[in-house]
Amino acid sequence: MHYVAIEESRRDLLKQLQERLEARLEPARAAAIEAFARHFYATVPVEDLVDRRLDDLYGATLSIWQFLQHHDPQSPKVRIFNPDFEEHGWQSTHTFVAVLHEDMPFLVDSVRIELNRRGLTVHAIQNAVFAVARDSQHQLKALTSPKDENAPDARESLIVIEVDRHTDAESLAKIERNLHEVLRDVRTAVSDFDAMCGQITSAIQELEKNCPPQIDPDDHEEAIAFLEWLLKDNFTFLGYDEYLLDGNELQRDPNSVLGVFRLDPVSYTHLTLPTIRLV
């Protein structure tokens, strides 16, 4: 019964939003935005919606819809702003963080973790994946639920997060830069994920061929079992590289680098192993 009441509250609120859209916008635009809102707000906790004035929900919906209109899938889009009634037509006591990105794993958690790392309290998270079609100039042509019949092939993830209000422009710009760096890390790790798993598979196959005489057979089998366990979705591979034994020194093989290790080494000095002298 509680679930039914919650969904009835959601439907009532979205109905009010639909009526407001139809009263203020031309029919085709109102219908497109209403369809977007129905999907975007489908999983948002009702209390996050009912706490807003209808005018603020209307303004937020239009603002997010406008944010979606242009997006190059090869370049993530990040916007951080403080809604102001005079400037945006709606208001909030929070700072809004909006992210539009080609859909892939780890996006929401990575953005949330970065905001938490910066000491920002997250008050609400709204996330939805859309099927989209864009023209050659990256303008939005169609946007639907991925479950819709004949939905476009491309998928984009929209993330909207409300955090503590920050008014310092320099601070907001720094948050935006940091989020771009985090999203770069995500794209790099995800794009190389299959290749990293392939390297682990190759290592397993190599180990299965023979056990070096100086290695205890039980330890050898345990190492193989551990690598196999990692591949069964028990570990998230973010980076990979190899070290070659040259005399009594280990040298990093630059051709083996995958994932986040491919990025600016200055940003990953804490991940880069120094040359190690064996004794």
Regions inferred by a protein language model and the residue ranges of each:
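Charge-rich interaction surfaces and accessory domains that mediate macromolecular binding and assembly
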Residues: 1-92, 96-100, 113-116, 128, ...
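Short, surface-exposed ligand-recognition loops at beta-strand->loop->(often short) alpha-helix junctions
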Residues: 100-106
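Short, well-structured beta-strand/strand-turn elements
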Residues: 119-126
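Long, intrinsically disordered, low-complexity Ser/Thr/Pro-rich regulatory/activation regions
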Residues: 145-148, 166-167
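Beta-rich nucleic-acid/ligand-interaction surfaces
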Residues: 128-146
